[in-house]
Amino acid sequence: MAFRMLLMGLPGSGKTTLMRTLAGQYRFAAGKLQVGVTVKAAFLSQHLQELDPSWRVLEAVEKVALHVELGGGREISASQLCERLGFDYEGQQRMVRDLSGGEKRRLQLTRLLMDSPNVLLLDEPTNDFDVETLTALEDLLDTYAGVLIV
């Protein structure tokens, strides 16, 4: 079942802290977080994760999985997901070390999606994206069958 939640607040109001807590990166000072056994969460932070600079884009994605199910029985390859997020054939052959900040963020998101999460936590997901990438991301997330928290 698809569910969407938008977190809004002033800078410093705790949006990122809440997301990191939900992703299991922070501990509660009090209380507890109970996660169901079928929950598979993925967190896209504002900060770029280090990726091996010697990898090619497609290689970095295929290290997670070769295929991913998008829901409704639809399955696509790592290469097809790369294309949906703006990495054409030439882009998939580029070295990670040669990517811009926005391209690395796009690659990070692609890798998260390849892991088949049913809960996506996206902290300021549009940072560093151009209009074309934003449109592709919006189209992809519109069809996302899981829980989406932005």
Identify the meaning behind each predicted range.
Residues M1-V150:
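ABC ATP-binding cassette signature C-motif
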